[in-house]
Amino acid sequence: MKTRLTSIALAALLLAGCAVGPAAKAPDVPVPTAWSLGSGDAAPDWAGLLDPQLAALQARALEANRDIARAALSWKQAQLLAEQSALRWAPSASLSANASRPIETQSSTRNVEVGGVTIPVTTSTGWSRSYGASVGVGYELDLWDRLAQSTAAQRANAEATRTDIDAARLSIRSQVAEAYWTLAAIRAQKPLAETQLALTRETLELTRSRVREGKLLPIEVDKIAVNLQAAESRLADLAADAQLQRQILALLLDEPLPGPSPEAALPAGEPPRWRLAEPAEVLARRPDVQKARFGVDASLARLRVSEADRYPRLSFSAGLSTGGSHARDWLSQPLASLGTNLIVPMIDWQRLALQRDGARTELDAAALTLRDTLQRALADIETQRIEAERVAQQLAANEGRLREATENERLAALRYEVGAVARADWLQTRSAVLDAEQGRIRLRLQQWVRQAALFKSLGGA
């Protein structure tokens, strides 16, 4: 028996040394070497974008947000699965014990006379006890790296789940900043909108008076009425937007509605022009790209497992058992066993081939997902930079409009003082200045929101 077991083990080891194991490789995905637009001098960092109040709100959101908590729980579950898979490397042990109490088979015979006839009667009485215990150890030799690749697949899945935490953190920080800056812009626009509404109402009354005097056509009243309706709608929109942004902050901070109302203010000055690293380095920091890469790693590991399933498996086992009806029998009747199990797939090749083809298809799909994720990530970064340039150009145009409107208002005020123009005409030039100032605030909001979106698209830098 020992000779047979040894021969089987040697045969398996020879197979391990001579056969060619699975050698699946990960697909290559090209990445551009340069950006289409030039970059600035400052390193990407949130520190230049935050005031203390916004930083505190972001910290509270990162601590209390439910999306991050759910992602953390999913990661913990994936880690537990990976740890369970790693246990397959360790030897497995078993322990069993049993006890029985059957009726004894000892019997006695006696004669009974019935009607002068002697009849033998046999009876069995009493109980007996029997106890037993056994212990065993088993271990599978990882000839073709099958167990290691199975564990690697679970670990890659766990790492892919971890990236959801990073993605959630980036998203939460960006959303908090956007809501905070939107509230700041609303706060800055509100007094301007209220002043513009008051000026428009006064202009409407003056225009009606001039129409009654025959100095203007009635159509001028309709034009000012349209402006008044627009001013009222703008002020109502600001109030509604403020409530919506407070609700967004409440959800992000896991607080009851209507949410906080911070004394927010837009950052002073222009957003910095960030210096970007090489595309490959930037993309490697993005959570979505990391998740796609871990998906490829997991699929590749599963393909290697399916390849290894086509090769023999070798496992060893050892056991020790004993038992008896008395304690002295436990030491006098032990039974030891050693075993070697060699599984060679010879008639299941079709199923194994289909399993391997399915794993290869999964790897191809994961590679396509990675390629698509890389392309979308590049497009996202370039889009944010293009939009930032567009907003900068719009802001420069707005500066020219504001200068022109301010100069027109100054000249109109001088002409009104000397009686060259009516008060309604001067009020309209003043309203144009207020409109340009509100447009400037909205563009500055877009500028900083785009900066936060760029930071998010860079993977946190």
Name what the model sees in each region.
Residues 1-8:
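Bacterial N-terminal signal peptides that target proteins for export
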Residues 20-25, 52, 72, 88-167, ...:
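Small/polar-residue-enriched beta-strand and adjacent coil segments characteristic
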Residues 31, 37-38, 215-217, 236-283, ...:
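Short, solvent-exposed, mixed-charge loop/turn linkers that connect secondary-structure elements
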Residues 63-66, 379:
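Surface-exposed, polar/charged faces of alpha-helical domains
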Residues 70-85, 168, 172-209, 224-227, ...:
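Amphipathic alpha-helical coiled-coil segments
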Residues 212-240:
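Repeat-solenoid scaffold signature
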